[in-house]
Amino acid sequence: MNVKELRNQDVSTLNETLIKLLKKHFELRMQHKSAQLDDASKLGKTKRSIAQVKTIIRQKQV
């Protein structure tokens, strides 16, 4: 998801997106531990997306 698109969303939608990303990150970590993950860069990309969403949520709260 694009940062511009994230900035246009309200906080409740961002929280839902954050929950989805956290679940996805957990699943990717489990796949990585069991050697089923083909592309390990997905972990980093998901982690970065989580950080972006958290940052935007915090900016909207202030």
Swiss-Prot record:
Keyword Ribonucleoprotein among record annotations:
yes
Q: Family assignment?
A: Belongs to the universal ribosomal protein uL29 family.
Species this protein is from = Ruthia magnifica subsp. Calyptogena magnifica
What is this protein's name? Large ribosomal subunit protein uL29
Annotated keywords: Ribonucleoprotein, Ribosomal protein
GO BP? translation
> Cross-referenced NCBIfam families, in alphabetical order?
L29
Q: Give Gene Ontology CC terms.
A: ribonucleoprotein complex; ribosome
Q: Which GO terms describe its molecular function?
A: structural constituent of ribosome
Q: According to its UniProt record, what is one Pfam family this protein matches?
A: Ribosomal_L29
